[in-house]
Design a protein with these regions (language model features):
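Phosphate-binding/catalytic loop of phosphoryl-transfer enzymes
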Residues: 57-59, 65-164, 268-270
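ATP-binding/phosphotransfer module of carbohydrate and carboxylate kinases, centering on a glycine-rich
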Residues: 1-57, 67-70, 89-97, 112-121, ...
Length: 270
């Protein structure tokens, strides 16, 4: 039995996991404006509501850069006070339970590899589309973090007049002074501009998938995050863009591209 913590953009979730299922969950808005210690106290209190003597491990999914070996969290964007938090050490000292801390997208792909669309494959890439873009990599059945825990930061690669994140996340809608939610509603009503915007997102995402295939050559790519819930609006344009001028067409026919259907990925993969 283990306990998992998901530090989302706005909410903090703590769940107890048994046999790959969340059996108890507490959730509340994260005290994002609190001091380092105030946020930690929120952690401690919520963990205390869920933990039992049978819990053998605590796993934490963090939306930031993490030193996986040391369990140190750096520069959490939505929590300004968290510049360098030795989270593994603090939780192990407080609860006496072995703790691991990892980037949330690594947790996402780990969950998909074990329980979701990546089950049965050895080489998996998972990407999440939301306010930003992240990627997690499983190779030979292990999460690959790189020498300095920076593997998978494909969002930072140059693209057009910026980088891929600016064109494959909600930042693209920001360029149009709108939101994905608004454009989804308009597209459903037949608005041609909104439909074109979702197709443009799909086009850029197809180019990002080309990068993933060229660099990682996975068996399966799994797409998750809030924007992925609108996959039916951009999937066709995405696949057309992926095939356009791709140098190894046979690779596209072999790779599986799936949209995540797994709930509580970050909790299950932490």
């Amino acid at each position: 039995m283990r306990l998992s913590i998901d530090m989302g953009g706005t909410n903090l979730r703590v769940g107890r996991i048994e046999n790959g299922k969340v059996v108890k969950l507490v959730q509340e808005p994260c005290n994002a404006k609190g001091t380092e210690e105030e946020v930690l106290e929120q952690f401690y209190r919520m963990i205390g509501e869920v933990i039992t003597p049978e819990v053998e491990r605590i796993g934490v999914a963090v939306p930031s850069v993490v030193d996986y070996e040391q369990g140190i969290v750096y520069d959490v964007m939505n929590i300004p006070s968290w510049k360098e938090v030795h989270l593994k050490e603090k939780l192990e000292t407080r609860f006496g339970v072995k703790t691991t801390v990892d980037n949330d997208v690594n947790c996402f792909v780990n969950a998909e590899y074990q329980f979701g669309a990546g089950k049965g494959y050895n080489h998996v890439v998972g990407i999440t589309l939301g306010t930003g873009v992240g990627a997690g990599i499983v190779t030979n059945g292990q999460v690959y973090r790189g020498a300095n825990t920076g593997a998978g930061e494909i969002c930072c690669l140059p693209y057009r007049d910026g980088n891929y994140e600016e064109y494959t996340s909600s930042q693209l809608f920001n360029k149009w002074n709108t939101t994905g939610k608004d454009e989804a509603e308009k597209a459903d009503q037949g608005d041609e501009t909104a439909i074109a915007r979702w197709n443009e997102l799909g086009y850029h995402l197809g180019k990002l998938l080309q990068v993933i295939l060229y660099t990682y050559d996975p068996e399966v790519i799994i797409i998750g995050g809030g924007i992925a819930q609108s996959s039916f609006r951009f999937e066709k344009a995405m696949m057309e863009s992926l095939r356009e001028n791709f140098q190894y067409p046979h690779e596209i026919e072999r790779v599986k591209i799936a949209f995540s259907e797994l709930k509580d990925c970050n909790l299950l993969g932490a």
